[in-house]
């Protein structure tokens, strides 16, 4: 079982289409737990507030207070992430996208455990090459596998907040599906 834990900063349609060329079968499970607009707004506001607070250290804030002039040095990464959260809030408010928690899992089976492990390594390598962070589950393997079953919404829940456009870009729309 390979689980995607980290996501790239940008997405495009057919983002994970490279998996189709690996030459073996796998089961792709996408579980998206959508948030209503109020809950998504609350979560995004919390993210924005946390990132905005990280722009300046406590020492910088104290120095600004004592000297009564703003410091030119800010954490630009935190500033950019606060701006991203603000842009996400604006997209949510305009109704362009929705937000939710996404869990992507790829299950591989083979009668030979060594072949299954090699297939898992190939899948992990292909996913990581696209800017994701994928892990071959070991300790959490049973929970991850249970989370791939329909109706099991509580096993292997991941917490990254993604919007619906990213979800559409990660959907296996280019794959052949026999059933």
Protein language model regions, located:
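Extended, folded cores of ATP/NTP-driven motor/assembly subunits in large transport
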Residues: 1-175
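Glycine-rich phosphate-binding loop of nucleotide-binding enzymes
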Residues: 179
